[in-house]
UniProtKB/Swiss-Prot annotation:
Record keyword Protein biosynthesis present: yes
Residues binding L-tyrosine: Y39, Y176, Q180
Catalytic activity reported: tRNA(Tyr) + L-tyrosine + ATP = L-tyrosyl-tRNA(Tyr) + AMP + diphosphate + H(+)
GO biological process, any: tyrosyl-tRNA aminoacylation
Protein name according to UniProt: Tyrosine--tRNA ligase
Highest taxon, organism lineage: Bacteria
Family assignment from sequence similarity: Belongs to the class-I aminoacyl-tRNA synthetase family. TyrS type 1 subfamily.
Natural source organism: Mesorhizobium japonicum (strain LMG 29417 / CECT 9101 / MAFF 303099) (Mesorhizobium loti (strain MAFF 303099))
């Protein structure tokens, strides 16, 4: 990686964000001489972003922090189709109402990460439905479609994957990359946007936009992608025992979010501190140098700093305090995740297997049984060895809850409802 002159690209390089850049020298010179507008696109396929999206959102933060202007593009139009990149099947089509609801949910996270306003480098949020839904089909084919080579589009990895597996790729999905390329041109015209950023799986789509801009007479456009983020053991990030790691607290609690980062593998701590926190690099180097059990302190800092960015400092501190009380003092913290159980069902008795699934500590009865056989399950801090164990009202603590635990770090309170 070259020694960048601009603050933004130097920050991106030092913190490990860069996978590919379409023209390193040209983009570096552009950042060094003027305020640059750049964007990341987010399709509204759910009511929240997940931690995979946090990488690109953090890039937008550093873009603004180094004096440039970020755009968060909501895919209100492209979400009507769905991105086929590296998928085995076609996405379910969403209604306009569902997309609008999803966009409202996604907006919440950006309010914590970016500064919005009317200043020269204040962030803006735009929706590609504003131009895509107004297109005339025949004019679009004539003015835009003629610049795309089907032969070249068929060589993109995201398309080849589907075709090589002899899986259907609809004409609807095939058009997605054309629309994404056109988004770049529209933002160049409307907002003088010169750079699109995204994950490495979006490289082909972004380059389409760079090439389309050249053919349609925009100023030089640029592409920058991040590496696919995996753990040191090779696992793709973003999944937990409870499913996807969402950024909105109503889908994945701040406590669970904190715990996700606290459970980071030792080998990943330095890399994740660089990418997901705003700590100075010398402080990160100090934390990364900790050995033995001291590395756990670095993991706690990673968890607290990342949770503070996504959920706010108060929620992060509360999550850290809950963990401390639960693990270090053995106390029953009232901020642990909670699920309700029907009181009548508890009176009759609820099987431990189904209760573990309900609590999100297992994905199936089979997985719950394996946890019990492995000695990982406890009720009120007492080990469970019988997978036919029934949980009843007799198990309620003085606080009127049943504490379910999986291993040392995962706890859920069951309350009669």
């Amino acid at each position: 990686m070259p020694a960048f002159k601009s603050d933004f690209l130097r920050t991106m390089s030092e913190r490990g964000f860069i996978h590919q850049i379409s023209d390193e020298t040209g983009l570096d010179q552009l950042f060094a001489k003027e305020t640059v507008t750049a964007y990341v696109g987010y399709d509204a396929t759910a009511t929240s972003l997940h931690i995979g999206n946090l990488i690109s959102a953090t890039m937008l933060y550093w873009l603004q922090e180094t004096g440039h202007r970020p755009i968060a593009l909501m895919g209100g139009g492209t979400s009507m189709i769905g991105d086929p990149s590296f998928r085995d099947d076609q996405r379910s089509l969403l209604t306009p109402e569902a997309i609008a609801t999803n966009i409202e949910g996604i907006k919440r996270i950006f309010g914590r990460i970016l500064r919005f306003g009317d200043g020269p480098n204040d962030a803006i949020m735009v929706n590609n439905a504003d131009w895509l839904m107004k297109l005339n089909y025949v004019e679009f084919l004539r003015d835009v479609g003629r610049h795309f080579s089907v032969n070249r589009m068929l060589t993109f990895d995201s398309v080849k994957l589907r075709l090589d597996r002899e899986q259907s790729l609809s004409f609807l999905e095939f058009n997605y990359m054309i629309l994404q390329g056109y988004d770049f041109v529209e933002l160049a015209r409307r907002q003088n946007c010169r750079l699109q950023m995204g994950g490495s799986d979006q490289w082909g789509n972004i380059i389409n936009g760079v090439d389309l801009g050249h053919r349609m007479g925009t100023p030089q456009l640029y592409a920058l992608t991040t590496p696919l983020l995996t753990t040191s053991s090779g696992a793709k990030m973003g999944k937990s025992a409870k499913g996807a790691v969402w950024l909105n607290g109503d889908l994945f609690s701040p406590y669970d979010f904190w715990q996700y980062w606290r459970n980071t593998e030792d080998a990943d701590v330095e890399r994740f501190l660089k990418i997901f926190t705003r700590l100075p690099l010398p402080e990160i180097a100090r934390l990364a140098a900790l050995g033995g059990s001291e590395i756990n302190e670095a993991k706690k800092i990673l968890a607290t700093e990342t949770t503070a960015i996504v959920h706010g400092r108060e929620a992060a501190n509360q999550a850290e305090e809950t963990a401390r009380k639960t693990f270090e003092e053995g106390a029953l913290a009232d901020t642990l995740p909670t699920v309700g159980a029907d009181k009548a069902a508890l009176e009759a008795g609820i099987g431990i297997l189904s209760l573990l699934v309900t609590a999100g500590l297992a994905s199936s009865n089979g997985e719950a049984r394996r946890h019990i056989q492995g000695g990982a399950v406890r009720i009120n801090d007492q080990s469970v060895s019988d997978d036919r164990r029934m949980v009843t009202l007799q198990d309620l603590s003085p606080e009127n809850v049943v504490k379910l635990s999986l291993g040392k770090k995962k706890h859920v309170l069951v309350r009669p409802a």
